[in-house]
Amino acid sequence: MLLTHLNEENQPKMVDIGDKETTERIALASGRISMNKEAYDAIINHGVKKGPVLQTAIIAGIMGAKKTSELIPMCHSIMLNGVDIDILEEKETCSFKLYARVKTQAKTGVEMEALMSVSIGLLTIYDMVKAIDKSMTISGVMLEHKSGGKSGDYNAKK
């Protein structure tokens, strides 16, 4: 497969998307943060001194999606139509699963924005609770679904 971010001299370049068609693009990404029971209970019971952890993670995830092109060198700056984040409580494993759905009308997809949104949301949870549990783990950050564009739809294997 040809790497599109390299020119003929094997040097980095940003792909020219000028001739591509503007279409609706949607991406859904997810990831998980696991922690000890004390940290999990502190989040659920709103006992974290830094404030409301899950609400802050949602805001951070939205900000992460908006800042993606500033942090990933070959990522195009695109207008986002919406970012929707859900955080599921997983009591039995003392973890939270974060989903980010990003939508746009553009010439390129929003997979990186969805993945960045998940990553920043989970890192925010870690930051806010690290005083209680430094051994938290972030895992399984992945693209679940994408639609729109020339390459068509993608659904992760379950």
From Swiss-Prot:
Alphabetically ordered keywords of this record: Lyase, Molybdenum cofactor biosynthesis
Binding site for substrate: 74-76, 112-113
Any Pfam family: MoaC
Active site: 127
Annotated pathway: Cofactor biosynthesis; molybdopterin biosynthesis
Annotated catalysed reactions: (8S)-3',8-cyclo-7,8-dihydroguanosine 5'-triphosphate = cyclic pyranopterin phosphate + diphosphate
UniProt GO molecular function: cyclic pyranopterin monophosphate synthase activity
GO BP of this protein: Mo-molybdopterin cofactor biosynthetic process
Domain of life: Bacteria
Gene3D superfamilies cross-referenced by the UniProt entry: Molybdopterin cofactor biosynthesis C (MoaC) domain
Matching InterPro entries: MoaC, MoaC_bact/euk, MoaC_sf, MoCo_biosynth_MoaA/MoaC, Mopterin_CF_biosynth-C_dom
Enzyme Commission code(s) on record: 4.6.1.17
UniProt-listed HAMAP family: MoaC_B (MF_01224_B)
Family: Belongs to the MoaC family.
Assembly mode: Homohexamer; trimer of dimers.
Function according to Swiss-Prot or TrEMBL: Catalyzes the conversion of (8S)-3',8-cyclo-7,8-dihydroguanosine 5'-triphosphate to cyclic pyranopterin monophosphate (cPMP).
Protein name: Cyclic pyranopterin monophosphate synthase
Record gene name: moaC
